[in-house]
Amino acid sequence: MARTKQTARKSTGGKAPRKQLATKAARKSAPATGGVKKPHRYRPGTVALREIRRYQKSTELLIRKLPFQRLVREIAQDFKTDLRFQSSAVMALQEACEAYLVGLFEDTNLCAIHAKRVTIMPKDIQLARRIRGERA
C-alpha cells in the first residue's frame, strides 16, 4: 500500500466524548429543579468596558438637563434671589461641568493605576486635585 501525505487540519477542539458510567447517566437524566434557567450574566468588568467605549464615542450630555438646572438654580439662590437664566447659559454651564468632571476622572484613573489598582478611590480624586493645584 502506497504512503500518502497528510495535510494539517484545524482541530475542532476538545476531546472525544467518553461513555458515562450508569450512575452518572441516571443522575443527569433526572430533571433539574423545574427546568429553571439561570439568567445570562456577563463577567465582571465586561459591561463596564462596553459602557466606557460607548460613552467615549458619544458626544451627548451625560447628566440629565432638568436635575442639573435645578442644582444650578439652588446654588445661585445663595448668591442672589430671583435670578433668571437663559437656556443657553444653563447648557454652557453643563458642558463646562461635564468636561471638568471627565478630565478629573481621567486624572483620578491615572492615580489609581499608578497605585497599582483598577478601582478609583476618594484619595485618588484628592491626589489628582492636589497635583492640579485646585486644592492645597
Swiss-Prot record:
GO terms for biological process: chromatin organization; epigenetic regulation of gene expression; gene expression; nucleosome assembly; telomere organization. The modification N6-methyllysine is found at residues 5, 10, 19, 24, 28, 37-38, 57, 65, 80, 123. The modification 5-glutamyl dopamine is found at residue 6. The modification N6-glutaryllysine is found at residues 15, 19, 24, 28, 57, 80, 116, 123. One of its GO terms (molecular function) is cadherin binding. The modification N6-acetyllysine is found at residues 5, 10, 15, 19, 24, 28, 37, 57, 80, 116, 123. A lipid is attached at residue 19 (N6-decanoyllysine). Acetylation is generally linked to gene activation. Acetylation on Lys-10 (H3K9ac) impairs methylation at Arg-9 (H3R8me2s). Acetylation on Lys-19 (H3K18ac) and Lys-24 (H3K24ac) favors methylation at Arg-18 (H3R17me). Acetylation at Lys-123 (H3K122ac) by EP300/p300 plays a central role in chromatin structure: localizes at the surface of the histone octamer and stimulates transcription, possibly by promoting nucleosome instability. Citrullination at Arg-9 (H3R8ci) and/or Arg-18 (H3R17ci) by PADI4 impairs methylation and represses transcription. The modification Phosphothreonine is found at residues 4, 7, 12, 81, 108. The modification N6-succinyllysine is found at residues 15, 57, 80, 123. Belongs to the histone H3 family. This is Histone H3.1. The gene is H3C1.
